[in-house]
Amino acid sequence: MLGLRTCLDPRDAACQTVPMFEHKPRPEWIATEEFISNAVVHPDAAVEQAIRTAAEAGMPAIEVAPNAGKLLKLLVQLSGARRILEIGTLAGYSTIWMGRGLPHNGKLVTCEYLPQHAEVAWANIDAAGLGERVEIRLGPALDTLAALAEEDREPFDFIFIDADKQNNSRYLDWAVRLGRPGAVVVLDNTIWEGAVLDPGLDPVNAPGIIDALKLLGDHPKLDATVIQTVGSKGWDGFALARIT
C-alpha cells in the first residue's frame, strides 16, 4: 500500500509536512486483485466496515489490500503467535485481520497517534468481536514502544510495522527488543513505486525505507527477505523477517 500513514512521532519535523505519495495501479492489477479477493480471500462484513468507516471519516485509503490482510492473518496462524504488536492502526483494518488469526487467549497491542483514528479503529475492532483481544495505545509510537519495554509483559510473537517511513529503522530496532527469538516481523511499503531505486521520486519517505532495508540485511538478529507486490495499491512490497 502506498501513501502516508499516520505520523507516529510528531517530534520528527519531516513528519509534519509529508505529502501523500501517489500510487499508480494498472487496471489489470486491480482486476486481478478483485478476482483473487472474490475467489480466495472472502473479506467479511467487519473488514469491509473498516474500509467504509475510514472513508466516511475522511481517512486516506491506505490500508493493506484484502489479499495482504488475509496473508497477515495466515502468518499469525502459521507462526502460532499469541501476542501481536502493530505499529500504525489507522481504521483497524489490518488489526482485524491479524486479530482474527489469534487464539481466544491472544492479545494484540496497536499503536496510533491520532485520537480520531483510534476512535474509528476501536469502533471497528469492537464490531468485529475483537474488543477483548485488542488494546489501542494512543500517542507517539516511539514513546509507546519505550513504555512497553518498561512494562512487565511477555515478548511479542508477531510485529507488523506500517507507519511513518522516516522512523522505520527505529521501529525495527524496537521490534527486536520487544519480540522473542523466533518472532515474525512484517514491514510494509518496501518498494514504494520504485522509490527505493530512485529516492528522488519521494525524498521524504524513500530514505527511511532504504535505511530500513539495509538494516534488515545487516542486523545480526534479523533474517529477512522482501516480496514485491502489485495491485490496487500500486507497485510496492513488504519485508518478512524472523528474529534470531
Role assignments for model-derived ranges:
Residues 11-44:
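N-terminal auxiliary segments of SAM/dcSAM-dependent transferases
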Residues 54-55:
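N-terminal beta-alpha supersecondary unit
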Residues 7-8:
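Intrinsic disorder
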Residues 40, 58-65:
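Short acidic-aromatic active-site loops that bind/stabilize oxyanions
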